[in-house]
């Protein structure tokens, strides 16, 4: 029998100005999405913005793809 994985919270937080950022960083959701749409892989994005873990990059991209 396959176990159902726990739901994971998105690593996104809105700042005082309403800008959505990857939690614990200054990197915005828009930045991740723009670089992804320009053709960067999740690995390249995580390397470019080293404060964002690869898992968080995948979570943000998944959120973006699911909601567009």
Annotate each language-model stretch with its function.
Residues 28-68:
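Long, charge-rich, low-complexity alpha-helical segments
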Residues 23-27:
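Short helix-coil-helix linker/hinge
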């Amino acid at each position: 029998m396959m176990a159902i994985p726990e739901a994971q919270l998105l690593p996104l937080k809105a700042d005082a100005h309403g800008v959505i950022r990857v939690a614990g960083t200054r990197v915005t959701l828009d930045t991740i999405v723009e670089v992804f749409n320009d053709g960067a892989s999740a690995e390249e994005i995580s390397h470019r913005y080293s404060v964002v873990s690869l898992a968080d990059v995948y979570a943000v991209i998944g959120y973006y793809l699911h909601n567009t």
